Structures are given as C-alpha cells and as structure tokens.
Amino acid sequence: MRRRTFLTAGAALGLTPVMGMSALTENTEQKSGEKQQYFEWIRFHLPLGSRQGLVSEYYRDVAIPALNKAGINNVGVFNVKHGPNDPTLHVIIPHPSLESVVTLNDKLLDDNSFVQAGERFLKSPMSDMAFVSMEKTIMKAFTNLPEIQVPTQKKENKPRIFQVRTYESPSLTAAKRKIHMFNEGGEIAIFQKTGLQPILFGEVICGDRMPSLVYILAFDDFEAMNKGWSVFGNDPDWKKLSGDTFYAETVSRINDWIWTPTGFSQI
C-alpha cells in the first residue's frame, strides 16, 4: 500500500510538478493535525576588517527585538566553526506561515523607528557595505517536527554546537521518499530515541541545489556529537529502516556544517 500510494503520487508529480507537490504537502499536513512553521535561512557573506560585526550588531540590537515584538520568537544567529572558509553569519527565522515569510520584511521597513534604529545596516553605502552578499533558503517544517525546537543546552545556559546537514536528492520523487523516511518511516523518532536532539527539519521549497532538505541537531560538543551518531548507527530500528529498499537512492549529496551560536542567539 505504501509503495502504491507513492507511485500514484509520483505519477502526478511527473505530469504536473507544482500541483503534485502541493497536493502531497497538503495531504501530509492534514494528517499531522499541527500547523507547520516555515523557516527562513539567511546566509550573510561578510566583509573583512572592522565592518564584519555590523550584521551581528543589527540582529542583536534591532532585528531580533523587532521580530520578537512582531510575534516571531526563537530566532537563531550562528557563526561557522567548520565549513566554508569565507566569513559568514547564518540566521534562522521561524515563521508561522508562508505569508509571514513574504510580508514581514516590508512590514518592518514600513516602521520608521525600526529603519532609524537599524540605519547603519539598512542604509549602508557601497563604500561601507554591511555585507558582501546575502542568500536565502525557504523551508517548510516536517510534519513530525512542525516547529523549531529550543535545545536543552540553551534553556540551561550551557555551551552547544549545531550540526547542519543538507540532503540533496536525484529527483523530486526521491526527495519525497526521503522526507517520508524521516516522518512516516520513523527516522526522526529514532533520532530522538537515541539521544540526537533535532532543532528543525525542513523541506527546501525555495533555494539553490533543489530538491533538498535541511536538518539541524544540537550537541554539547564534538565528543557528544560523535558518541550520539555512534549510538544512532548501531540502533536496531535504524538498521532495519536503512535497509528498506523503498528508501534506496534517495540522497545524492550531503553537505555538512558545524555552527556555534552567537551570544544573543535564541536557539
């Protein structure tokens, strides 16, 4: 039954890609009974020298307070510990709806007090740019983890690192099968059972290198991360799930980063 349902959906997906994906997503959301968040992942490529801290200062002093006032909480801001060498700052903003993703920025910029407070960033001239470039990825939360999670370490004011992984898939139907593996297949539940601490799982609906998904895990440190993955890899339920041929050849490329939170990150 599982394969028959997926093959039918895949046929629709091949004939009408946008409508097929929408139908699958809506069907899953109805089953979950919970409203899924949308995540905005912003990557700032920073200049060298004294201007490198302008983006951090803007989020710390202006953007996060304004977002919280607008009802957007648990905003994460991170530095890269292991990943590309160029200086970057990563921001994760959870939204209650896709409409919020589209409209929030304009609402903030229509507020004169907000623009004045963030003028150094928002109106930075070409001769003194706050960032070199900015990239965005928009994701929809998985049904089995519909909202961003605040890690235990943050709640207890303890150090933490984040492992960020993107899974690229060779086709649209393969991407849907991998998401199915995390949700209905039980992979997220195995993560949680074995002590891995998910922060978010998101299907990329707008961004580069699609089709793909993103997930973020929190750990105390590298030792805890390695230990956690060892427990996961030896779990009987994971061994059974990973051997299921229904989920074979769903991931064509994996990208991996390690982030550390800024002092003002809410995640």
Predicted regions and their residues:
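N-terminal export signals
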Residues: 3-25
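Short, glycine- and small/hydrophobic-rich beta-strand elements in well-ordered beta-sheets
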Residues: 22-34, 64-90, 96, 186-214
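Short boundary motifs at domain starts and secondary-structure transition points
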Residues: 28-34, 127, 151-158
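C-terminal functional regions that serve as terminal interaction/effector modules
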Residues: 35-37, 187, 191, 207-267
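Short, structured motif recognition centered on aromatic/hydrophobic residues
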Residues: 38-44, 66, 88-95, 136, ...
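Hydrophobic, ordered structural segments
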Residues: 45-54, 61-69, 74-153, 169, ...
